[in-house]
């Protein structure tokens, strides 16, 4: 297990911060959080759609 972890650390050292942000999705306009319909429902911005009738 220690050998696996040290290999992971060595691999991460080769990746720059900007490349890591791209891989993890942190450099997108939504800051790594993908806006979904369920997220919007929790935030009540879609409430009028579901309660209009």
From Swiss-Prot:
Recorded consequence of changing residue 14 to D: No loss of activity or protein production
Thermal profile of function: Thermostable.
Disulfide topology: none
UniProt-reported outcome of changing residue 35 to A: Low activity, less than 10% of wild-type
Result of altering residue 20 to M: No loss of activity or protein production
GO biological process: amino acid transport; defense response to Gram-negative bacterium; defense response to Gram-positive bacterium; killing of cells of another organism; regulation of membrane potential
Posttranslational mods: Maturation of lantibiotics involves the enzymatic conversion of Thr, and Ser into dehydrated AA and the formation of thioether bonds with cysteine. This is followed by membrane translocation and cleavage of the modified precursor.
Chain residues in the propeptide: 1-26
GO CC entries: extracellular region
Effect upon mutating residue 52 to A: Loss of activity
Effect of residue 36 to S: No loss of activity
Family: Belongs to the type A lantibiotic family.
Function noted in UniProt: Lanthionine-containing peptide antibiotic (lantibiotic) active on Gram-positive bacteria including M.luteus, S.aureus, Streptococcus, P.micros, P.acidilactici, C.sporogenes, C.diphtheriae, A.viscosus, G.vaginalis, P.acnes, L.monocytogenes and M.smegmatis, and Gram-negative bacteria including C.jejuni, H.pylori and N.gonorrhoeae. Transiently and partially depolarizes the transmembrane electrical potential and pH gradient of susceptible cells, inhibits the uptake of amino acids and depletes the intracellular ATP pool.
Name of this protein: Lantibiotic mutacin-2
Organism: Streptococcus mutans
Protein's gene: mutA
């Amino acid at each position: 297990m220690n050998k696996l972890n040290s290999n992971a650390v060595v691999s991460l050292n080769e990746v720059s911060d900007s490349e890591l942000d791209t891989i993890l999705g942190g450099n997108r306009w939504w800051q790594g959080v993908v806006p979904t319909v369920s997220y919007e429902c929790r935030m009540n911005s879609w409430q009028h759609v579901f309660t209009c009738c």
